A protein has these predicted regions:
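Nucleotide-activated chemistry modules centered on ATP-dependent adenylation/adenylyltransferase
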Residues: 33-260
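Short, positively charged and aromatic/hydrophobic N-terminal segments
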Residues: 19, 27-37
Length: 260
């Protein structure tokens, strides 16, 4: 059908598709630019730094206490398998960005299930944070339309890590860190910068990491299958959920047009 033959509904449909496609292209370009910038700026290899820290811990024959912020059970699976060999861990589930609240509760149950079933050399404890969704929405004001992976996400990192640092200080933990760097979509450089800055504020050491290295993400998918964990298809917040739904709808419309 030529463009002149389109009716109003078809034009509107095409317009929606163009908006979503342009939004995704813009996001992809921004992500590539950010990755290149981070590669140029990143002087630290966080995995190597973590290796050195663990070597030091082993040589001192200590078992430090680690306060580990977890975004979800699947992401924490590899991190717990890896770090429970060297640390006594408390998993801190604090994610006020999650939408809806039923999703928040579902992810808590999956986290508790994993902790019960995962073998660990040292004890793994669990602590659930409050569902402070109003804090997330206050933080996100004015950033609602920014694609996933931008400034809104960076502020969300800090919101969650700050709460982890606060509890780590109160509980007199040796270290705190987060599972977030295991995701290919999360900015490890930014996470570690925020973590180290908060360490200075709260007086608790931040355990630097880039858990996606050494096939960490791949191992998390394997462990998720082994333990039958629910793996969500969006980060957690309503904005990432809406973005995934728009992308899904676009794919379905394109597949439908090809078939017809």
């Amino acid at each position: 059908m030529c463009a002149s033959g389109w009716n109003g509904a078809e034009k509107e449909k095409q317009s929606r598709k163009d908006i979503v496609r342009n939004e995704q292209l813009h996001y992809n370009k921004k992500q590539i630019c950010n990755m290149r910038r981070d590669e140029q700026m990143q002087k630290k290899n966080y995995q190597k730094e973590l290796d050195k820290k663990i070597e030091q811990i082993v040589s001192e024959k200590k078992v430090p206490r680690l306060f580990l912020h977890s975004c979800c059970a699947p992401c924490s699976s590899y991190v717990l398998e890896y770090l429970s060999e060297y640390f006594e861990i408390t998993v801190f589930y604090y994610n006020p960005n999650i939408f809806p609240e039923s999703e928040f509760e579902k992810r808590i149950h999956e986290q508790e299930k994993l902790i019960r079933e995962l073998p660990a050399k040292h004890t793994i404890h669990f602590q659930a944070g409050n569902y402070d969704s109003e804090k997330f929405y206050e933080m996100a004001k004015g950033l609602e339309m920014i694609p996933e992976g931008g400034e809104r996400c960076f502020r969300c990192y800090e919101l969650r890590l700050r709460e982890a640092a606060r509890f780590a200080k109160e509980g007199r933990y040796d270290y705190f860190t987060t599972t977030l760097s295991i995701s290919p979509l999360k900015n490890a450089q930014k996470l570690n910068e925020i973590g180290e800055r908060l360490a200075g504020e709260y007086g608790v050491a931040y355990l630097v990491s880039d858990f996606k290295k050494r096939n960490g993400y791949k191992r998390s998918t394997e462990l998720s299958k082994i333990y039958g964990l629910y793996r969500q298809d969006y980060c957690g917040c309503i904005y990432s959920k809406n973005q995934r739904e728009r992308e899904k709808k676009l794919r379905e419309e394109e597949e439908s047009s090809v078939k017809s």
